[in-house]
């Protein structure tokens, strides 16, 4: 059992806490801020532009070498990785407290830049956490360490995506206090990080004479993929597969608020119960991919995750009720998780084992970068099409990927 292992190995407990801290900012950007803005009367077209902060998670691969090769002055006395973790967690605490002092109804400029800063600091924190985890554990225990980190990440998202909404409601929408408390959690986490043991490794310094070989190392995985048949077509299928779902997710929380659901209902049903539906759906998605080949599994889960968007059209016509939201979240999260599992499985299959890490990063970065960029305009589409028209549009967005997969299913034997 994962929980038993965590309590037996203190290193896993450290990774659990770091995972929790890693997951907290993402839920703030995805959910908490959008709910706050919606209740403050900010237009949906403006709310979704805050999603630009998510781009840091897609682009972090470009500054991750800095985390490997440069130390933070003074703070690195506690360790190379810990220096970056302490810096990021301290700054995130200050950013969150500053965010709570802003008034969205009066001015959005400062809050906008603070949100972008939070995304950048959070993604940088993630890089350092992953590096610390990989450094601390032996090869045979990397699996349990990764599972612990993911478990903690989910808890962190529940804290700021669920508990924070509930706390804001019971304090009469005192968002300043809510963000202050979250900021204090990050401040306390900074103290904890100082106590974490870091395994110091001998790191090779960058040499200018090795730049040519470094470029070759980076480019080779890309050349390997693009040499294969239908490479561009496959890449487009990966990019479009989750686009409709990403568009839907970007406006979901403001949509619930507009329908009249309370923050506590969103916290309990969408975040807490929704996590259970997601876990079950992910498991079933794995079975589907095992039972069918890659393309057929993707087509099945792709169709399911797109048609479940009709549930939101149905929800839009219902008076606010616990049961209606529960049904919608069950259907949507279950199918979306099936699609995510299928996509991860397919991407993993596509990777050449010789270049697995870089090629996997290529696919995930291409997909998330496209999704995070396009979803910025989701609010404008809602204003143009209305809620039901927007939901139909998200269903249509899934069609290119499905048509491409059907085509590839006939052409490629995988």
UniProtKB/Swiss-Prot annotation:
Under InterPro entries, the record lists: AmpG_permease/AT-1 (IPR004752), MFS (IPR011701), MFS_dom (IPR020846), MFS_trans_sf (IPR036259)
Q: What PROSITE patterns does the database record attribute to this sequence? A: MFS
Record has Transmembrane helix as a keyword: yes
- How does this protein sit in the membrane? Multi-pass membrane protein
Q: Which GO terms describe its cellular component?
A: plasma membrane
Membrane-spanning regions, if any? 15-35, 44-64, 83-103, 109-129, 150-170, 176-196, 231-251, 268-288, 297-317, 324-344, 360-379, 385-405
Which keywords fit this entry according to its UniProt record? Answer: Cell inner membrane, Cell membrane, Membrane, Transmembrane, Transmembrane helix, Transport
Output the SUPFAM superfamilies linked to this UniProt entry: MFS general substrate transporter
User: GO molecular function terms here?
Assistant: transmembrane transporter activity
Where is it located? Cell inner membrane
* CDD domains reported in the protein's UniProt record: MFS_AmpG_like
Main subcellular location of this protein, as a coarse class: membrane
Keyword Transport annotated: yes
Regarding protein family, the annotation reads: Belongs to the major facilitator superfamily.
PANTHER family the record matches: MAJOR FACILITATOR SUPERFAMILY DOMAIN-CONTAINING PROTEIN 3 (PTHR12778:SF10), SOLUTE CARRIER FAMILY 33 ACETYL-COA TRANSPORTER -RELATED (PTHR12778)
* Record protein name field: Putative transporter AmpG 4
Q: Which organism is it from?
A: Rickettsia bellii (strain RML369-C)
């Amino acid at each position: 059992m994962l929980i038993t292992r965590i309590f037996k190995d203190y290193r896993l407990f450290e990774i659990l806490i770091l995972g929790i801290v890693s997951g907290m900012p993402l839920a703030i950007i995805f959910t908490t801020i959008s709910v706050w803005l919606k209740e403050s009367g900010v237009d949906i077209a403006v709310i979704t532009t805050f999603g630009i902060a998510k781009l840091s998670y897609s682009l972090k691969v470009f500054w991750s070498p800095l985390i490997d090769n440069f130390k933070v002055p003074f703070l690195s006395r506690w360790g190379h990785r810990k220096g970056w973790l302490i810096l990021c967690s301290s700054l995130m605490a200050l950013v969150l407290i500053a965010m709570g002092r802003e008034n969205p109804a009066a001015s959005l400029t400062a809050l906008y830049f603070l949100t972008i800063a939070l995304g950048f600091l959070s993604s940088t924190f993630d890089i350092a956490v992953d590096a610390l985890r990989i450094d601390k554990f032996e090869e045979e225990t990397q699996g349990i360490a990764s599972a612990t980190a993911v478990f903690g990440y989910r808890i962190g998202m529940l804290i700021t995506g669920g508990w924070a909404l509930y706390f804001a409601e019971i304090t009469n929408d005192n968002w300043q206090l809510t963000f202050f408390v979250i900021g204090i959690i990050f401040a306390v986490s900074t103290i904890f990080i100082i106590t974490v043991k870091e395994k110091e490794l001998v790191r090779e310094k960058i040499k200018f004479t090795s730049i040519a070989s470094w470029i070759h190392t980076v480019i080779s995985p890309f050349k390997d993929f693009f040499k294969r048949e239908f490479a561009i077509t496959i890449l487009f299928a990966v990019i479009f597969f989750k686009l409709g779902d990403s568009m839907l997710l970007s406006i979901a929380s403001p949509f619930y608020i507009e329908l009249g659901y309370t923050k506590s209902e969103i916290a309990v049903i969408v975040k807490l119960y929704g996590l259970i539906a997601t876990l079950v759906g992910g498991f079933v998605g794995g079975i589907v991919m095992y039972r069918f080949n890659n393309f057929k599994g993707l087509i099945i889960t792709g169709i399911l995750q797109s048609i479940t968007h009709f549930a939101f059209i149905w929800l839009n016509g219902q008076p606010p009720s616990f049961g209606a939201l529960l049904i919608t979240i069950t259907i949507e999260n279950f199918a979306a998780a099936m699609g995510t599992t299928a996509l991860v499985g397919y991407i993993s299959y596509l990777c050449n084992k010789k270049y697995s890490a870089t090629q996997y990063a290529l696919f995930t970065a291409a997909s998330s970068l496209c999704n995070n960029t396009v979803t910025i305009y989701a609010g404008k589409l809602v204003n143009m099409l209305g809620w039901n028209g927007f939901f139909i549009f998200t269903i249509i967005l899934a069609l290119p990927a499905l048509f491409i997969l059907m085509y590839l299913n006939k052409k490629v034997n995988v």
